[in-house]
């Protein structure tokens, strides 16, 4: 993808960002299931350190991780666009259009399974997939490792992050995963309201949250502080051409045919267009899709039924959804090693 899609101002300085992960109102998060924890869980073999997060940030923004050195992870996961790309479906190597929308990486640290079809279980498993995918960054991992080893400035960064382990596919994946664990949603008006600020959201948004939990049935799948059950559902999207089987490719069960992972709703105001195929430009269109009970009834999830929402109820739901978006973090492009 062209660099024009990547904003030059992108979250918190690294030291503040890392500190933010480790301190905060964990007690409040435990007391209110709709408030996310202020820390990112990490596996024992890849606990977060400032050095690992810094290495991962460098790799994430480095276009040298792609075949033609023309795109980085941030080309598709742009911080100023909610860590997505603002396109209906992703654009990869040589401007090749992919079949699915770029998912946000916000709060992926809280997800036990990754990607639209769940084919990767951890951030470490997922991290290098786009790099070597022919349609995405198209750089074989052995070639990537040799390229990184040829850049003198990376040697000390890898050593500081993973002493004695060298520059390998494992340390590249762990570094990227470490940075991605710091990509967390910022405080939204909804969060401030849940913490006691009654003026943080409108009466319309408050009513929308009530609808979200009952009549509209949204919380059946979009539950908890990350607004996802991390499950897979067929929501009846219209498709053109060959149907995308979704989770069925990984788990060939009838219920999984056409099913895709429930995305987070955090920062949803920044991640249009919506759905796994980018088919809706606005949140109102999304609400109307669910109000219809979906369009393609083939293998439809049992929870997808017509809702009979009124016009004002739809407006209230949109107001609530918009309240889930915080201020974009002020990430700055790092100086890359030479």
Regions found by a protein language model. Name each.
Residues 13-25:
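Bacterial N-terminal signal peptides
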Residues 5, 11, 27-338:
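Periplasmic c-type cytochrome electron-transfer domains
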């Amino acid at each position: 993808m062209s660099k024009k899609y990547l904003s030059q101002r992108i979250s918190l300085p690294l030291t503040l960002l890392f500190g933010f992960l480790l301190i905060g109102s964990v007690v409040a998060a435990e007391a209110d299931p709709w408030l996310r924890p202020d820390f990112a869980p990490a596996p024992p073999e890849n606990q977060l350190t400032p050095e690992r997060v810094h290495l991962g940030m460098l790799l994430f923004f480095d276009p040298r991780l792609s075949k033609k050195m023309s795109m980085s992870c941030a080309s598709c996961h742009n911080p100023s666009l909610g860590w997505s790309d603002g396109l209906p479906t992703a654009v990869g190597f040589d401007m090749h259009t992919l079949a699915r929308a770029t998912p946000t990486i916000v709060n992926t640290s809280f997800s036990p399974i990754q990607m639209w079809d769940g084919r990767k279980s951890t951030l470490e498993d997922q991290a290098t997939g786009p790099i070597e995918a022919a349609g995405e960054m198209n750089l074989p991992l052995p070639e990537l490792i040799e390229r990184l080893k040829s850049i003198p400035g990376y040697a000390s960064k890898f050593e500081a992050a993973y002493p004695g382990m060298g520059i390998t596919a494992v340390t590249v994946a762990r570094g990227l995963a470490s940075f991605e664990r710091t990509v967390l949603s910022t405080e939204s008006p909804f969060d401030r309201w849940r913490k006691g600020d009654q003026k943080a959201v409108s009466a319309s948004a408050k009513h929308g949250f009530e609808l979200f939990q009952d009549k509209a049935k949204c919380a059946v799948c979009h539950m908890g502080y990350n607004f996802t059950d991390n499950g897979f559902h067929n929501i009846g999207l219209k498709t053109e051409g060959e149907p995308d089987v979704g989770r069925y490719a990984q788990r060939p069960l009838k219920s999984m045919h056409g099913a895709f992972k429930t995305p987070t709703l955090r920062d949803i105001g920044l991640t249009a267009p919506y759905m796994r195929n980018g088919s809706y430009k606005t949140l109102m269109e999304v609400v109307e899709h669910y109000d219809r009970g979906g369009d393609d009834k083939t293998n439809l999830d049992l929870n997808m039924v017509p809702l009979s929402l009124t016009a004002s109820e739809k407006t209230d739901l949109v107001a609530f959804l918009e309240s889930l978006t915080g201020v974009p973090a002020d990430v700055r492009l790092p100086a890359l090693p030479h």
